[in-house]
Regions:
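Non-catalytic structural scaffold of enzyme domains
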Residues: 1-225
Length: 225
């Protein structure tokens, strides 16, 4: 029986990105299903953080995925990453945070880590995850987090060039002071396509590809689960 992977999104536009990555990286017989729930991010932004409603709704989605036959669930939004552990206790399949592989790779690349975000609700979860993973690995890190004010609003207004310009400006600042920079949201991965390679003074990591590569390892029975 073919493996089935479930992706839970808060931004519908990410369905296409993760579908493409799954087709490129995962075995051909792996099936994927997507749940795109815009309400999650809208409530998180409106409330300024996670609420019991969000934890319950994510858990409901995860349980539904397991009942549909999913072998693993991948959350694709850093804002809801803290919901992974509580939801995982309710099922018998892995529930994965999208940014863990990215953070783990960043820890291998430097001690000074810059975090760029366009949504304010992702800064704290991502920064905390860096510190948690560093502590688990026995590493000492310095974390600098910057919010790209106006970029998120520009993206959802369709002003992608404005979004990219704002993010690029903040990336240049972070690159000047850190050894590696991570993008706190999967929706930010697009900026790497428009940032000239010559300007990348330090590695800049995004989460989508690394997350799907970890899924491939999990399906193969390797580390990462």
């Amino acid at each position: 029986m073919a493996d089935l992977l479930a992706f839970i999104h808060t931004v519908p536009s990410l369905v296409g990105l993760f579908t493409s990555l799954a087709q490129e990286i995962l075995p051909a017989d792996v099936e994927v299903l997507h749940i795109a729930d815009e309400i999650l991010l809208k409530v998180v932004l409106a409330k300024g953080g996670l609420t019991p409603f969000i934890f319950q709704r994510v858990a409901d989605h995860v349980i539904a995925c397991e009942r549909a036959g999913a072998d693993a669930v991948q959350l694709t939004c850093s804002s809801i990453s803290p919901c992974a552990e509580p939801a995982a206790r309710l099922v018998e399949i892995p529930v994965l945070k999208v940014d863990e592989p990215m953070v783990d790779q960043a820890l291998l690349l430097g001690q000074r880590i810059g975090v760029a975000a366009t949504a304010p609700t992702t800064l704290q979860p991502t920064t905390e995850l860096v510190r948690q993973r560093a502590a688990a690995a026995g590493r000492t890190v310095e974390v600098e987090a910057l919010l790209c004010h106006g970029a998120y609003e520009a993206l959802f207004a369709g002003a992608t060039e404005t979004h990219d310009r704002i993010v690029h400006e903040h990336l240049r600042t972070l690159m000047s002071r850190n050894e590696v920079v991570i993008l706190a949201q999967a929706s930010m991965a697009r900026v790497l396509e428009t940032l000239p390679t010559a300007e990348r003074r330090v590695p800049i990591l995004s989460s989508p590809r690394l997350a799907v590569e970890r899924l491939r390892q999990i399906l193969a029975g390797g580390a990462g689960a």
